[in-house]
A protein has these predicted regions:
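Short beta-strand-to-loop acidic/aromatic patch adjacent to the donor-nucleotide binding site
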Residues: 1-8
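Conserved donor NDP-sugar-binding/catalytic core segment of glycosyltransferases
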Residues: 10-44
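Short glycine- and hydrophobic/aromatic-rich loop-to-beta-strand nucleating segment
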Residues: 34, 73-76, 80, 88-100, ...
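Short, flexible, basic/aromatic active-site loop/helix in glycosyltransferases
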Residues: 49-87
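Catalytic donor-sugar/metal-binding loop of nucleotide-sugar-dependent glycosyltransferases
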Residues: 85-86, 95, 99-113, 119-140
Length: 167
């Protein structure tokens, strides 16, 4: 399991998620539905990042319109996320990944300090099998979008995105 320190696990889901993965051998990585501490859903299941979708993600809050529609597509708001389903980008804040797959793909790329490392890991895991959202399992994540508030972190995110798209 990959867990950020700001994740609160509900209902002893780790063994349940592990069993779900054992029961579904074609799935190599999965994430539960994450919620903010106030109970709102975090829209973390995503499609494969593209430069356009990441730009739209950053600009949607300010400009809406086509940027908002692209962001909703990127965050899969046009899909039924209440049932287990394949996804293309598994958040690194809480993910279950098969140990053999994690070892085969070499774990996290050490060239990423922060940001986009989870997208990279997901894309390499997808070469080994399916990646799933498991909304029947839930956790709370006290997530903050720091890059938009801190120029240094935003620069770090841009550097990571550049590396990701060069791969």
């Amino acid at each position: 399991f990959i867990l950020n320190p700001d994740v609160i696990i509900h209902d002893d889901i780790l063994p349940q998620m592990a069993q779900w993965l054992l029961d579904h051998p074609g799935v190599v990585m999965a994430t539960p539905q994450l919620y903010f501490p106030d109970g709102r859903i975090q829209n973390l299941p995503r499609r494969k990042p593209t430069p356009w979708l990441l730009l739209a993600r950053q600009l949607a809050p300010r400009f809406g319109g086509v940027m908002q529609k692209a962001d909703e597509h990127y965050t899969m708001q046009d899909e039924d996320l209440t049932i287990p389903r394949p996804i293309e980008f598994c958040t690194g804040s809480f993910a279950a990944i098969r140990t053999d797959v994690f070892k085969t793909i070499g774990g996290f790329d050490p060239e990423y300090f922060m940001y986009v490392e989870d997208a990279d890991l997901t894309q390499r895991a997808l070469r080994q099998g399916l990646v799933y959202l498991l909304p029947q399992f839930t956790a709370t994540h006290a997530w903050h979008r720091d890059p938009m508030r801190d120029a240094g972190k935003f620069k770090m995110q841009l550097k990571s995105m550049g590396r990701y798209f060069k791969k």
